[in-house]
């Protein structure tokens, strides 16, 4: 039986909704992080024959080609296998599993796995235009919100959080306390530079010139119980889930370079982890 090892693990900094990464389409962002992950692994990109990319939200014309465009931009061969998977919140994890399975089955010696999502670029869909909206207003569906909405009528994922809070007896104060601790830990780790080694710096073109984006912008330093207590429920009257204690809407990418352990050892490559 083959063993699968991780040769590199690289991510972008996390961009907040409509923040620094909002101007990059997923295929471009994925390509930048792909390329850095491959460079750090020490593997020739032409040797990597398999890639799986987790991606959910429709964005623009190259949405369906996010895996192929990312791999080509990273220097992989046109002969390589590249496909996207949508398992909603677990898409990136499924991508890692799928790439690892390809190695275990002998379909590849080296593979990429991870995901990219730019929620800020979620498309608005207008189904009526296909057959011709002949007169009057027509509906525009927010694809980003649609992905966050239960397809069987329960509602937004925020309602799922409300239902779980009731089911497990999790109070508003407990949720706020967890959020404060999470924000403060993130802020402390950023201040101490603990994430620098895992982040691929991204050069962004702006009106003021090139700007290097290499620090998570979503965490809010200085968050307190007092500030969170002032926030109103976001999804349900008299609910407990707010914009301050709920999961954030953000943008980013993260990828592993995976390898068969025996092949990596023969090539003199040192793994950082084992699956």
Predicted features and spans:
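Acidic, glycine-rich active-site loops and adjacent beta-strand->loop/helix elements
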Residues: 10-13, 54-58, 87-91, 115-124
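Active-site-proximal alpha-helical scaffold in enzymes
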Residues: 86-117, 159, 165-194, 256-263
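Flexible glycine-/small-residue-enriched beta->alpha junction loops
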Residues: 110-163
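N-terminal extracellular/periplasmic Venus flytrap/periplasmic-binding protein-like
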Residues: 10-12, 22-32, 40, 174-266
């Amino acid at each position: 039986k083959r063993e699968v090892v991780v040769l590199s693990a690289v991510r972008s900094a996390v961009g907040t909704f409509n923040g620094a990464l909002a101007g990059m389409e997923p295929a471009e962002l994925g390509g930048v992080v792909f390329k850095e992950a491959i460079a750090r692994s020490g593997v020739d990109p032409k040797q990597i024959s398999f890639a799986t990319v987790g991606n959910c939200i429709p964005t623009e014309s190259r949405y369906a080609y996010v895996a192929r465009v990312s791999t080509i931009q990273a220097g992989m061969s046109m002969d390589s296998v590249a496909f996207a998977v949508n398992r909603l919140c677990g898409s990136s994890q499924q991508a890692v599993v799928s790439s690892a399975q390809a190695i275990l089955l002998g379909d590849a010696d080296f593979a990429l796995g991870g995901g990219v999502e730019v929620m800020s670029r979620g498309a608005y869909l207008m189904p009526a235009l296909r057959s011709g909206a002949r007169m009057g207003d027509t509906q525009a569906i927010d694809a980003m919100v649609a992905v966050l909405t239960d397809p069987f009528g329960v509602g937004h994922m925020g309602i799922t959080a409300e239902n779980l809070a009731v089911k497990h007896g999790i109070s508003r104060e407990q949720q706020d306390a967890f959020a404060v601790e999470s924000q403060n830990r993130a802020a402390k780790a950023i201040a101490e530079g603990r994430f620098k080694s895992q982040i691929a710096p991204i050069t962004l073109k702006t009106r003021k010139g090139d700007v290097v984006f290499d620090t998570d912008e979503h965490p809010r330093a200085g968050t307190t119980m007092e500030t969170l207590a002032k926030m109103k429920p976001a999804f349900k009257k008299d609910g407990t889930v707010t914009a301050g204690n709920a999961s954030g809407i953000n943008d980013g990418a993260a990828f592993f370079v995976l390898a068969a352990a025996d092949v990596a050892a023969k090539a003199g490559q040192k793994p950082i982890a084992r699956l």
